[in-house]
Amino acid sequence: MRVRVAVIGAGSMGMNHLRVLKDFDEERVQLVGVAETHEPTLKHAMSRFHVAGYTDYRLMIEQTHPDLVAVVVPTHLHSEVALNVLDRGINVLIEKPITRTIEEALALLQIASIRGARIAVGHVERFNPAVVELKRQLLYGALGQMFHLHARRIGPFPPRIRDVGVTLDLASHDIDVMRYVADAEVEHVYAQTQRRVHSTCEDLLLGLLRFTNDVIGVLDVNWLTPTKIRELTITGEKGMFLINYLTQEVYFYVNDYTPTTWDTLRSLTGVSEGTMIRLKVQKAEPLQLEYQDVITAIVDDRLPTVSGEDGLAVLRIVQQLAESTQQGVYAGQQPSVAVEVEV
């Protein structure tokens, strides 16, 4: 089966989608059209990728009959565009976050169920080879009991992001990965945010997540740091994993502690610095792997790895982080105290 794919949105991320789709074997994937309201941007995409272009995505869908539509538009348009596509019974890949609000996401899930269409959400870090290898190691028991997750997703302010802050735009990546590697849901959150550079939205988030299996996650996310860092550490009884999303590297720092029957000595030890191991990772482009998964899901008639339900779960946690921030005590009042919110 050859899957016909159309893309809505030809901005910075949309161009990445078009590039990846063009790299597929045409016997498996056919790029049938791109829709973009800004005509100079549309013409550039048409010229570069030799694809039919439309200023009206509805007309594109009517004329190209796609099996899958990638929704790569600003977040505030996700709901409107995806709802229109799903109502036609067409599968969608929605760039993260799934929508701005839980109500919008629930509406998408409902129409998808009614029309028999699939929703995939572009939490692309799930397909990062470093995350894939990390999950494989965890399934093998390399870490033992998991204690703690710490995500650092920091870097300069991107002017192209105008309609959302770091919690929805950046932290959603790490929330999704944490749910995946912890293999548990979040039950409590606490957060603090600040707005320093962005004109309307928060550009700094510090958040705590407590999972149902008692693992604690830390989110350190901002658009204020003059260098780009994308890292996750996972600490457990046998050591600590460190993954670098940008370089797709995975390191394991072994806890060299050797159990002993001497209770007094045991109370003084428990963790000891050991060997650092660099794991072998086959590097690949996460977006391409994401498309491979979504296309295979269509052909095999199964759910994609990152489903609409996953997107909704992440959005619920994002909302809880926002509510936690709002319940804190602000400037001019008494020092802020921790507010724990049940998810």
Sequence positions of predicted segments:
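C-terminal helix-rich "cap/oligomerization" subdomain common to oxidoreductases
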Residues: 68-70, 293-343
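N-terminal Rossmann-like dinucleotide-binding module
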Residues: 1-48
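Hydrophobic residues in well-ordered beta-strands that form the structural core
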Residues: 55, 94, 119-121, 243
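Contiguous beta-strand/loop segments that form the cofactor/metal-binding neighborhood of enzyme cores
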Residues: 175-253, 281-302, 321, 337-343
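Beta-loop-alpha module in the N-terminal Rossmann-like domain of NAD(P)-dependent dehydrogenases
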Residues: 17, 51-110
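A contiguous active-site-proximal alpha/beta segment in oxidoreductase catalytic domains
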Residues: 99-161
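Mid-domain beta-loop-alpha active-site segment that forms a flexible
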Residues: 122-129, 157-188, 202-203, 290, ...
